[in-house]
């Protein structure tokens, strides 16, 4: 395959043993696809499917008035264009959203006519609120901040059977239960109690016998028994009776009387157990009926009502037990044939019969009344109310919705096939079948469901969550509309008078703004963004809660394979509740996770890929991706390791149906970025995956030497890089933008053949890290669609680069790497390897107060000129100013309340005029502990308020930039068009033209070059056809100019109109500070294998351990961090990184030769490196120039890819090390025979250490836990109101709590005065602490401790318990 523009600049050598059958799918597809389906904005109204907004509207409309005379129908909806784009919304603190307008129709019926006829119809578009739009990268901009809606994993609608595992009853008996869960509506539960009576409950209310529900749906006791039992038939005799003989019902029973065949020969004696031989003998004897004694009938249960044939009187009821008196009554009434229920102790329990006995309701109405009383206790049951309630419970589409998923799950669980046909409400059959399956379970047949199986849990995505909220808003609107529809006719109302969009806006706003699933996007680096969008949470509304979630829900389940990552989940209370989607997983139409497999046809692995959900997968045998195949795609081994229904086993190749797509299929994005993951302990891999998300982007990103090959996918899919939308030639590049002239074949007619990519420069992310894009193309480069044009934060040549490659030595060093501490060389800090830029946003608002407006100004009293010298005339700081804590950024004064003046002051006022002290200084200052450079200032002014100079200049700059974009587009379009015109004109005959061009003359290039290009249109061509083309060209150019002018005007209008600010705010100013954070002791760092630590010391280069050739180590880690933690992957990474660097050094040596030899020798060496082991690279497809450019990029090390579970083996690493360090080099550097260790020397003494040390390169990250953000000190500051003790925490500028144990320590030392000082004047003795302050100012260091405020609080608490407590003062 051909390499892309960036790939061929730096080819990653892969150690994968097998080619990828399928590329990693687009990583944000789930989010984008889901929201697209929800909006269906670009779909024509007629083609819209019933999903998302369309489904919400059509489920609520039409709305009919109470009297049925007016109805409001939904026609269609349309989404408008958003007013501001994403960037503008972020700057102005707005929501990126589109206005939603629905076309509705009001139909009024004529009251006068007997049959309904339409009197009038009014149609109108009604505004329905704003719907937030998703950005191209799957996030939302809500109130100026980027947020992500996390998908929710919830229990699928359907019917589920389970038991209590013997925990409810002390006997340990299993109590079975069933539950019907709809998508919305009442839950229906069925459960057995310890006495084997079956109950049902609605919405977890009081339980009632299940036969009440069966009677309520119209069944009689007879039909209930007929549905759940088989019958035994008896013919009554004057003494005893004859019983129909059914052989299988007798097996294993104890004979209660002698059983004889037709000839009277006894086959089974009394009190003997009947076995299979007896039954065979009886069958051979041809027995149809058996004579049974009288007492055999006692205790049996009648299946039907027994009626006296003569009088019609009921002698005995169905479900009555037969006693002597009942038998006599039946004989007296001349009843011959009776039917009883067939039950036994083993697998035919009498449960429904027992339940029927416990149920006292007489008929259907009584049953429904009982249900009504349970649902609405205390309300009088009228017949209509009872009927309505029962219908609304399970049968009304308004209140009950199983959804397609629910219907499919119910059908498949009740054995009706896997389709979703059938009503979306419950049916009587569903209820009956469910009870039947539950009774069968109690009888010991069938299996309970596993609720943690991914076939029983489904994912709700953004679109579905938003749709539910939208529907909730519409329901509120519906209520209001119903009320008003009655007046529609009389008051001549229009649809927009009926519909108020507030409830919809409120529901949407609440969901996007404050739902548990709408989260502040984690934007530390590209990986954290992408992982956040692929997250699947079991928490949230309608999900689990942390406290209730047990161990099983959190655990890894066999069905997670290929769907949910078994590694990546947070540590702490949320473990296992928040998961990440696996690399290849996607959602099917029902919302279940599915994963791809390669189909095996006739024992041969094909390239056909099928996606299987957890339910479908259980029917197949699936081989793993690393199973050995021959060239034809058949399995090599006689036994293949496979999975079937969650179990692992070995089986013959002929039995296998599918095979995994890739070894990395089971892990998530973050876990798939860990090289040698297969050698790490699971707990550490979890930490590694989580900590990569906290890596701070470095100033100069550096690609990992040892990667896994997924880095490019992540960088591109996350949207941090800039990708070419269309192929073409780079026309212009600077730091801010890339301009591309599009290839003709990719350009749509009538469109501008220019793509301009404005790059994001020094922008603040949600986590205050810096987002900055840098172009990586040069003018004249040819790029194809999808090529990377610019790197973003943490990307290097289009690959994810979270950290830096560091030379690491595993050895102890003077205790500075005790307990995971990290020793770092000063050179790392000097080279700015881990320096990162953090951007802080500081905001100040000028409000309109009661005493007058606040003012942004440079004119502030009581401030020295030196404090104001960074401000411009408007009182706003200059861009580029370096500021530190407490410097003024924006001058602001607030009017102060009038104070009562003394007569003297009044006199002075009268003489000297107004004094300027009636304002106080409330300027924006730099917070404590922060220094940085001002990189941007934004000024927002309310409509109708005059802009200051600064605001105007910002707008002018913005317009100038926009104009330049338009001019560039125009220039390229015009050049392109004029080139074509020139080709057409040269050599043509003319009728005349400018500069006295004679008729019949032929046009030349020189003549055209002499003219101004716009004068070419004045040439009159002889050929009519060409003249028309020339005229059209002129028109299209003028049209383009006009379009661009319009675009510019629109932009200017947008910028010059006032800004929308919160009420009472006149002006808002945002100042952005760039803070440079260098690496320092106390910063947290980590590798990718969960090997984290804190920088303990930064040591001078000359003191670091160094190699024989003088190369000092960058980082010294403790070797004791490896064995107990079992993350051996880091050691392998170090070895392979060492090889990667060595190969780079060898290439650098070759490049020192003269040019002609270079390409040849380098090509040979690269062939060796890339094609000795693992998958091969196509070096031969590159030209000599490209090979040399590649070699230049590889001088600092050849990047390797060792994919997860398919990576480099020890032998391969050994081979690479030999290629990298030939014998002469190894000897010079004093490496050991394996090349993986070296003899090091102590930098301080120059002595050799006493044994060789493992040394090599590891990709090491700096995490977002920086000591600068945590370090904090307080002198004086705010106090808590009630206790008067200092607040806690850095954010409140609080103090350090001198806690209980610290007090014990001072008590133990007997330091009583220190202790007194700590508990009084340094804490909450109010008078004491003010006194101390005064004393210190006077230079008199005496303390006088008084009563701590907390004691007064205690006294008050005791008084609140009605105990009076007074102090005796002496």
UniProtKB/Swiss-Prot annotation:
Source organism: Bordetella pertussis (strain Tohama I / ATCC BAA-589 / NCTC 13251)
Reaction(s) the record says it catalyses: RNA(n) + a ribonucleoside 5'-triphosphate = RNA(n+1) + diphosphate
Task performed by this protein: DNA-dependent RNA polymerase catalyzes the transcription of DNA into RNA using the four ribonucleoside triphosphates as substrates.
Gene Ontology BP terms: DNA-templated transcription
Subunit text: The RNAP catalytic core consists of 2 alpha, 1 beta, 1 beta' and 1 omega subunit. When a sigma factor is associated with the core the holoenzyme is formed, which can initiate transcription.
Family matches, as HAMAP family: RNApol_bact_RpoB (MF_01321)
Pfam families recorded: RNA_pol_Rpb2_1 (PF04563), RNA_pol_Rpb2_2 (PF04561), RNA_pol_Rpb2_3 (PF04565), RNA_pol_Rpb2_45 (PF10385), RNA_pol_Rpb2_6 (PF00562), RNA_pol_Rpb2_7 (PF04560)
Protein name (Swiss-Prot/TrEMBL): DNA-directed RNA polymerase subunit beta
GO MF terms, alphabetically ordered: DNA binding; DNA-directed RNA polymerase activity; ribonucleoside binding
The keyword Nucleotidyltransferase appears for this protein: yes
CDD domains with a match to the protein in the record: RNA_pol_B_RPB2
This protein's GO CC annotations: DNA-directed RNA polymerase complex
Primary enzyme class: transferase
Domain of life of the organism encoding this protein: Bacteria
Species classification: Bacteria, Pseudomonadati, Pseudomonadota, Betaproteobacteria, Burkholderiales
EC numbers, comma separated: 2.7.7.6
UniProt-listed PROSITE patterns: RNA_POL_BETA (PS01166)
SUPFAM superfamilies: beta and beta-prime subunits of DNA dependent RNA-polymerase (SSF64484)
Similarity comment text for this entry: Belongs to the RNA polymerase beta chain family.
């Amino acid at each position: 395959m051909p390499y892309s523009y960036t790939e061929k600049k730096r080819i990653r050598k892969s150690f994968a043993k097998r080619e990828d059958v399928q590329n990693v799918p687009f990583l944000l597809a789930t989010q984008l696809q889901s929201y697209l389906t929800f909006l269906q904005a670009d779909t024509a109204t007629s083609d819209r499917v019933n999903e998302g907004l369309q489904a919400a509207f059509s489920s609520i409309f039409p709305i009919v008035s109470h009297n049925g005379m007016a109805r409001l129908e939904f026609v269609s909806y349309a989404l408008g264009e958003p007013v501001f784009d994403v960037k503008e919304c972020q700057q102005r603190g707005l929501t990126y959203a589109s206005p939603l307008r629905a076309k509705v129709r009001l139909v009024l019926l004529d009251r006068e006519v007997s049959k309904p006829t339409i009197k009038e119809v009014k149609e109108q578009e009604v505004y329905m609120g704003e719907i937030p739009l998703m950005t191209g990268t799957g996030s939302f901009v809500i109130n100026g901040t980027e947020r992500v809606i996390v998908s929710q994993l919830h229990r699928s609608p359907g019917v589920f059977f389970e038991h209590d595992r013997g925990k409810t009853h002390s006997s340990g008996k299993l109590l079975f239960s069933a539950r019907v869960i709809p998508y919305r509506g009442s839950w229906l539960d069925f459960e057995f109690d310890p006495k084997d009576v079956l109950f049902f409950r609605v919405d977890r209310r009081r339980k009632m016998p299940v036969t009440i529900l069966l009677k309520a749906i119209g069944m009689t006791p007879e039909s209930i028994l007929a549905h759940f039992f088989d019958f035994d038939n008896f013919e009554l005799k004057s003494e005893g009776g004859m019983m129909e003989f059914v052989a299988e019902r007798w097996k294993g029973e104890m004979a209660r009387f002698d059983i004889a065949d037709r000839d009277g020969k006894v086959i089974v004696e009394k009190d003997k157990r009947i076995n299979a031989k007896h039954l065979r003998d009886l069958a051979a004897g041809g027995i149809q009926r058996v004579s049974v004694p009288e007492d055999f009938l006692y205790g049996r249960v009648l299946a039907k009502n027994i009626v006296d044939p003569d009088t019609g009187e009921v002698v005995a009821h169905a479900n009555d037990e037969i006693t002597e008196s009942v038998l006599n009554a039946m004989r007296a009434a001349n009843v011959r044939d009776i039917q009883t229920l067939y039950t036994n102790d083993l697998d035919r329990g009498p449960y429904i019969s027992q339940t029927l006995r416990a149920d006292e309701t007489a008929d259907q109405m009584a049953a429904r009344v009982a249900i009504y009383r349970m649902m609405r206790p205390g309300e009088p049951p009228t017949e209509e109310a009872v009927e309505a309630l029962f219908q609304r419970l399970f049968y009304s589409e308004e209140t009950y919705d199983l959804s397609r998923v629910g219907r499919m799950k119910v059908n498949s669980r009740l054995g009706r096939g896997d389709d979703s046909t059938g009503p979306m409400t419950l049916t009587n059959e569903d209820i009956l079948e469910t009870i039947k399956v539950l009774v069968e379970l109690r009888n010991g047949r069938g299996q309970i469901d596993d609720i943690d199986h991914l076939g029983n849990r489904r994912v709700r995505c953004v679109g579905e969550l938003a749709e539910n909220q939208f529907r909730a808003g519409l329901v509120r609107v519906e209520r209001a509309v119903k009320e008003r529809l009655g007046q529609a006719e009389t008051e001549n109302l229009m649809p927009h008078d009926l519909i108020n969009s507030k409830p919809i806006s409120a529901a949407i706003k609440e969901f996007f703004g404050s739902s548990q699933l709408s989260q502040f996007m984690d934007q530390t680096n590209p990986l954290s963004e992408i992982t956040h969008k692929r997250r699947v949470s079991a928490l949230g509304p309608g999900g689990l809660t942390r406290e209730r979630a047990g161990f099983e829900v959190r655990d890894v389940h066999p069905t997670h394979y290929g769907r949910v990552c078994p590694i990546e989940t947070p540590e702490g209370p949320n473990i296992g509740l928040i998961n990440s989607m696996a690399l290849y997983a996607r959602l099917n139409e029902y919302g279940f996770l599915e994963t791809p497999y390669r189909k095996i046809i006739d024992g041969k692995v094909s390239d056909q890929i099928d996606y299987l959900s957890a339910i479908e997968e259980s029917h197949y045998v699936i081989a793993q991706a690393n199973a050995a195949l021959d060239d034809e795609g058949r399995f090599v081994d006689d036994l293949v390791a496979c999975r079937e229904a969650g179990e692992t086993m070995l089986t013959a190749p002929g039995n296998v149906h599918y095979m995994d797509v890739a070894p990395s299929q089971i892990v998530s994005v973050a876990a798939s970025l860990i090289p040698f993951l297969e050698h790490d302990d699971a707990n550490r891999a979890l930490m590694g995956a989580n900590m990569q998300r906290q890596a701070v982007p470095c100033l100069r990103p550096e690609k990992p030497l040892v990667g896994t090959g997924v880095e490019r996918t992540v960088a591109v899919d996350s949207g941090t890089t800039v990708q070419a939308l269309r192929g073409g030639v780079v026309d212009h590049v600077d730091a801010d933008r890339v301009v591309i002239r599009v290839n003709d074949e990719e350009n749509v007619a009538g469109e501008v053949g220019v793509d301009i990519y404005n790059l994001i420069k020094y922008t603040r992310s949600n986590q205050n890290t810096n987002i900055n894009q840098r172009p990586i193309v040069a003018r004249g480069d040819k790029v194809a669609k999808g090529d990377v044009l610019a790197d973003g934060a943490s990307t290097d040549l289009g690959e994810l680069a979270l950290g830096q490659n560091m030379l690491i030595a595993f050895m102890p060093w003077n205790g500075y790497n005790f307990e995971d501490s990290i020793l770092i060389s000063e050179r790392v800090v000097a080279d700015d390897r881990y320096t990162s830029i953090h951007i802080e946003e500081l905001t100040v608002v000028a409000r309109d107060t009661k005493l007058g407006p606040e003012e942004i100004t440079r004119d502030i009293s009581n401030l020295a000129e030196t404090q104001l010298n960074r401000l411009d005339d408007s009182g706003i700081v200059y861009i580029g100013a370096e500021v530190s804590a407490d410097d003024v950024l924006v001058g602001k004064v607030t009017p102060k309340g009038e104070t009562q003046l003394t007569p003297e002051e009044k006199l002075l006022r009268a003489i000297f005029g107004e004094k300027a002290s009636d304002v106080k200084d409330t300027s924006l200052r730099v917070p404590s502990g922060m220094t940085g450079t001002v990189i941007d200032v934004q000024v927002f002014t309310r409509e109708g308020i005059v802009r200051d100079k600064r605001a105007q200049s910002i707008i002018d700059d913005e317009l100038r930039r926009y104009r330049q974009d338009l001019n560039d587009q125009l220039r390229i379009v015009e050049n392109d068009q004029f080139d074509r015109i020139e080709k057409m004109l040269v050599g043509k005959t003319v009728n005349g033209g400018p500069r006295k061009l004679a008729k019949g003359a032929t046009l030349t290039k020189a003549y055209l070059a002499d003219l101004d290009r716009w004068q070419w249109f004045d040439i009159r061509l002889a050929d009519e056809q060409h003249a028309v083309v020339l005229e059209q060209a002129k028109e299209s150019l003028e049209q383009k100019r006009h379009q661009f002018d319009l675009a510019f005007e629109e932009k200017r209008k947008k910028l010059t109109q006032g800004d929308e600010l919160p009420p009472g705010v006149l002006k808002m100013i945002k100042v952005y500070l760039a803070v440079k954070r260098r690496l320092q002791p106390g910063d947290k760092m980590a590798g990718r294998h969960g090997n984290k630590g804190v920088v303990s010391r930064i040591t001078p280069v000359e003191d670091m351990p160094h190699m024989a050739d003088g190369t000092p180590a960058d980082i010294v880690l403790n070797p004791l961090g490896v064995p107990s933690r079992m993350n051996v992957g880091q050691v392998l990474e170090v070895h392979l990184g060492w090889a990667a660097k060595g190969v780079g050094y060898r290439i650098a040596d070759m490049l020192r030769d003269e040019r002609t030899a270079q390409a040849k020798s380098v090509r040979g060496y690269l062939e060796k490196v890339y094609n000795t082991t693992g998958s091969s690279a196509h070096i031969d497809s590159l030209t000599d120039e490209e090979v040399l450019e590649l070699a230049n990029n590889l001088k600092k090390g050849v990047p390797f890819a060792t994919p997860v579970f398919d990576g480099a083996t020890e032998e391969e690493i050994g081979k690479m090390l030999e290629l990298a360090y030939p014998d002469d080099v190894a000897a010079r550097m004093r490496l050991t025979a394996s090349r993986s260790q070296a003899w090091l020397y102590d930098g301080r003494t120059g002595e050799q250490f006493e044994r060789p040390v493992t040394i090599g390169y590891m990709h090491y990250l700096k995490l977002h836990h920086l000591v600068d953000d945590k370090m904090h000190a307080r002198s004086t500051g705010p106090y808590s109101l009630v206790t008067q003790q200092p607040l806690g925490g850095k954010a409140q500028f609080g103090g350090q709590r001198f806690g209980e144990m610290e007090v014990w320590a001072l008590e133990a030392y007997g330091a009583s005065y220190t202790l007194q000082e700590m508990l009084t004047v340094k804490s909450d003795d109010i008078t004491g602490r003010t006194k101390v302050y005064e004393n210190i100012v006077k230079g008199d260091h005496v303390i006088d401790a008084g009563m701590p405020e907390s004691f007064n609080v205690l006294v008050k608490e005791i008084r609140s318990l009605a105990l009076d407590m007074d102090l005796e003062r002496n």
